[in-house]
Structure formats: structure tokens, C-alpha cells
Amino acid sequence: MGDPRLQHIAENFDSMKRDINDTFRFHCTQCGKCCINREDILMSPQDVFKAAQALQMTPHDFVQLYCECYLGSSSRMPIVRLQPRGSIKRCPLLKDRKCMIHDAKPAVCAMFPLGRAIRIDKEDAEKDELPPMKVEYIINPIDCGDFSETHTVRDWLESFGIPLEDEYFLKWQKTISMLSPRIQKLEKKLDDNLMDKIISVMYIKLYLDYDLGIDFYPQFVKNADGCVEMLKMILAMPNEEAV
């Protein structure tokens, strides 16, 4: 899926970077423009959990109603994104120009116009333990709202209750970085039928297998670590045992 926004970020990441004390000008006028012509609103497991809670439905039902699932072309990870609607590619959670889950909106929406990422060397991703990671912030192109307010990156994140060193975000990025190269190795080792089963288990454990009445993060850590250990175990098996 070649979304131009994601391609722009990949090609211009360094020039878009901002320090936590850097300032930017932006004022949200609640015009809803950032909720249309969007194909890049990816849902993390925490996003799915919070949205399902807000709408009082299971994670499975939320994904079935509002999302699309696919395999990342390069990461080979199961990915969940909000499924845009209609010719204007409207976010499915936009109703009467308002977000249906405003207080539980995906982190990528809450942070706009900021974005965040970590960068991990491919060699490090192959290791059992990753080196310490640092969250890097970027300013996305702004084509909505106005520029009547000035904010620092730090203040903007704090206003939405997003930690600068977000424990969950770091764990999720670490999980992706550890799973992705191992999935790619297994794709060379196993047949398509078995890979489909492995990906299905990962998708369920990472995105769906949660009790909404219990704190999310401990459940996520258990599920994420279980997926990593599963892939390590399968990779360690002789080919004939893994099949």
C-alpha cells in the first residue's frame, strides 16, 4: 500500500525531526479535514483496545466493523488500519464532522500534527536483546486548522496525556523490530499454509486477545513476548519438525 503521506515521511524524516523543546505553530479548528483523504491511519494494539472500550464492543467486532487487516509489504507484520469510506476516503469513525471516539482516538490522531518513530539497525533487530531506544518526533505537513497558536513538542504531548518516553510505544516498536526479521526468515523456511497459521496466531494475540475489563499493558506485554518466543522456537526447529 503506497500511501503518499508515508512515503513523504520516509523520504524526509531527518528534515521533519523536532526536539522536544522545539516550537511549532498550529491551532485545531475542528474542521475535520485531517479525517478525510486518509489511508494511513494505522491502529496499534493499544488503539484497538481503547476504541473497543469506548464503543463497548470486543476488539474483534471493532476491527470487523471499522478496519482492514493486511500484511505489511516490507515488515511482513499483520497491520490493522482504519478502513476509509466513500470517495473522500473518510475515516469510518467520523460522524457529523466529529470523532465517535474523541477521548480514545488513535495516538496518531491525538498527536497530529506531530508524529513519532524509533530507528533500529537491521543487525540489532536480529539480537535477542535490543539496545536502548530513543523516541524521535517529527512535524507532519499541515494543511488544516490555522497557525494562531505556538506550542513546544513537550507541551503538545503533555496536553494529550502522551508520555515523552511512552513505555507502551517503545515496547510495541521493539516488538515489531524483533518480529519482522524473524517472520521474513520463516517465510523462506516454511510453506504458505503454515505461515498463514503463524500470522493468524500473531494477529489474534497482538490485536484481539484482551480482556477489556483488565489493564491493557500487562496483557500486551505477555502477548507480545509470547509471539517473539514462538517465532524464536520455530526458527530453532529443524525444517522437518517445523513443517
Descriptions of predicted regions:
Residues 1-43, 47-243:
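Short loop/turn segments that flank or connect secondary-structure elements
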